[in-house]
Amino acid sequence: MRGLRPALSTFIFLLLITGGVYPLLTTVLGQWWFPWQANGSLIREGDTVRGSALIGQNFTGNGYFQGRPSATAEMPYNPQASGGSNLAVSNPELDKQIAARVAALRAANPDASTNVPVELVTASASGLDNNITPQAAAWQIPRVAKARNLSVEQLTQLIAKYSQQPLVKYIGQPVINIVELNLALDKLDE
């Protein structure tokens, strides 16, 4: 019985620290130092939330740049079902999926080069990836330009404007947030 009191005291102390103080402290500091990130990195237009800078969206129209395929369950880019397809490189089903994606992209982009960028046919580990490389966006320019009646120069400048460089040049590669790029496309039409 003598050992019960210190054990119970330690349990209550740790419960208060890990279940109350620590979460409250991290929430307050997160809201104070990183309010945009702590609230989901939401992209707003006026009072309307158009998406998150962290999660891709399923853009299917010819007038939009398309991101990486999503491997999430039920619907594409479902944040509640995040996860990869878990198909190994040696799995024939993965080969079939990639071949189907390549064929669909070539059919939708007849004026683009025949070399489809790899990130447009392979899903990310989370299934929610919102970034593609500037090269993958540039590959889609002929289709988007034709659908929106824009010049190749306009779209090339837009891609350059929305390209994000890595923090350290030799670690990583430039990327484009597909949600922000497509929202910028919609603003060009206004």
UniProtKB/Swiss-Prot annotation:
Q: Which UniProt keywords apply?
A: ATP-binding, Cell inner membrane, Cell membrane, Ion transport, Membrane, Nucleotide-binding, Potassium, Potassium transport, Transmembrane, Transmembrane helix, Transport
Pfam families recorded: KdpC
One GO CC term, this protein: plasma membrane
Q: How does it assemble?
A: The system is composed of three essential subunits: KdpA, KdpB and KdpC.
Name of the protein in question: Potassium-transporting ATPase KdpC subunit
InterPro entries annotated for this entry? KdpC
Mind giving the lineage of the organism this protein is from?
Bacteria, Pseudomonadati, Pseudomonadota, Gammaproteobacteria, Enterobacterales
Determine if Iron-sulfur is one of this entry's keywords.
no
State a single Gene Ontology molecular function: P-type potassium transmembrane transporter activity
> Where does this protein chiefly localize?
membrane
How is the protein disposed in the membrane? Single-pass membrane protein
Mind telling me which residue stretches traverse the membrane in this protein?
Answer: 10-30
Keyword Transmembrane belongs to the record:
yes
